[in-house]
Amino acid sequence: MIAKLIWKDIRENFINTLIFAGLILAMTIYSLVKNFKDVRSLAVLSILIVAFSFIMVLGYAIYRGFSSLKREKDRNTLEFLLSLPVDGLEIVTSKFLAFFTEVLLLSLCIALFSHIPLFYMLITKAIGKAEFISAVKTITYIAFYFFLLALFLFIVFQFYEILVLSLKTKNFFVNAILFFVYLYLLSELIAIFKKVFGFLPDQPPILHTIGGETFTIMGGTNYQGLAAGALAGVVLIVSGIILFNKKVEV
């Protein structure tokens, strides 16, 4: 049943994924046509392709997290109600895995397209093989970082959607207050988890240089933060499944 639900969700959203992939490719081609000549500009271009692409993907993650369950619930059709499993494990897990598949495809597209300027620099001998490999490591890490961030945002907002459905709150201001309280408690939970992973290095992963320039991500995210975010995501998924089973009524 989970496999059927995943395929159903992917079919309904594959057009969105294709549109995003097309936008990312168009942005890449347009940027290259702008005739960036120096190495630093091409290096920055690769970073910008990754950054702006994932801004779109992160926005999509928030939208999907907010609307995934509510949209299904609002359909209220006999066909959907008959096909809907009452088990929260199937609903929550299938939604997450479907989005995981979509964002993985987008991440691969972003990683591939953002390497185009690097290949251009290598072909034109603007950089050597060693610097090319260094740049590839940096771009790949940044893409992987945003991939994890997109998944985390989806999980965060999906759990909030389950929370709202379980509490049956329809007042906008009540939901807004609930949202900010939820984010505050989540930040406190992550802070606790960071202490749990205190044995990990308290420093950002090492980023290599591109064209002689060193790039960092959002001030640098250390290993403790990455581990704490991953554990918090698991907690939210499990809590969402339990809450869905006990409180959400279809």
Residue locations for each model-derived region?
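Helix-loop-helix units of permease transmembrane domains in multi-pass membrane transporters
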Residues: 69-100
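Pore-lining and gate-forming transmembrane alpha-helices of multi-pass membrane transport proteins
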Residues: 51, 141, 145-149, 179, ...
